[in-house]
Amino acid sequence: MLSAQLKTYLAEMNMSATELQQKQLIGFVEMLDKWNKAYNLTAVRDPEQMLIRHVMDSLTVSPYLEGQRFIDVGTGPGLPGIPLAIMNPDKQFVLLDSLGKRIRFQKQVQFELKINNITSVESRVEAYIPEIKFDGVLSRAFASIQDMLSWCHHLPTEKGTFYALKGQLNQQELQEMPTGFSLVETIVLHVPMLDEQRHLLKIAKQ
C-alpha cells in the first residue's frame, strides 16, 4: 500500500527514485511508526500521513539543494534530513538534535536501512562547532527565521545557504530579516495530498 502511494507521489513531484531508495523511504516510515509508539517521536500517528507529511514534505526541498555538505538543525526523528539523504546519496548530511532518543532512532535507521551519508549528532545547535562549515543549513523546526539565523549563523560557509521550510508566510517576519542576511528566493512548494501552504525560503549571508 505505502509502496504504491510512494510511486504515485514521486511521479506527481516529477522525481525518480531507484528501487533501493523507495525501499529505504518506506522502511523509514515503517521504523518511525514502530518507534513512535514507544518514544513519541512525532504527533503524526498514521503511516500514510507520515509518508505525506514527513517524507514527501521533506523531499520537496531536494531539487533546490546546492552543494555537497548539509546540516539539518532541530532534525527531530530525521526530518527533512533522512529522506533527503536517501534521495541524494552523493551529498553528506549532519543531523543535529539535543534529545538522545531521537539520535538513537536516527542511528538505528542508518544501521537497518544502510544509509551511509548521514552523521547524527546529539547537541544544542548553539553549542555545536563544526570542523568544516556547511554548504547548506536546513530547518523546518524553528518557529521564527530570526531564531534560526541567530542560532545557526556560525554553521554555513561564507557562500552557504540557509534553507528554511515554512508553512504560511509571515510577511512581517520577512521584512524583519536580521542584519547581515538577505532573502535570496521564496519558493512555493507543493506536497501531494496536502492542501496546506508550504514555502522554502533561501537566505544568504551578506
Swiss-Prot record:
Cellular location(s): Cytoplasm
Protein's UniProt keywords contain Ion transport: no
Keyword S-adenosyl-L-methionine (UniProt): yes
CDD domains assigned to the protein according to its UniProt record, in alphabetical order: AdoMet_MTases
Major location (coarse): cytoplasm
UniProt KW keywords: Cytoplasm, Methyltransferase, rRNA processing, S-adenosyl-L-methionine, Transferase
Annotated InterPro entries: rRNA_ssu_MeTfrase_G, SAM-dependent_MTases_sf
Pfam families the record matches: GidB
Catalyses which reaction(s): guanosine(527) in 16S rRNA + S-adenosyl-L-methionine = N(7)-methylguanosine(527) in 16S rRNA + S-adenosyl-L-homocysteine
A cellular component term, taken from the record's GO annotations: cytosol
GO molecular function: rRNA (guanine-N7-)-methyltransferase activity
Main EC class the enzyme belongs to: transferase
Positions bound to S-adenosyl-L-methionine: 74, 79, 125-126, 140
Highest taxon of source: Bacteria
The EC number(s) this enzyme carries: 2.1.1.170
Coiled coil ranges: none
Family per similarity comment: Belongs to the methyltransferase superfamily. RNA methyltransferase RsmG family.
Known function: Specifically methylates the N7 position of guanine in position 527 of 16S rRNA.
Name assigned to this protein: Ribosomal RNA small subunit methyltransferase G
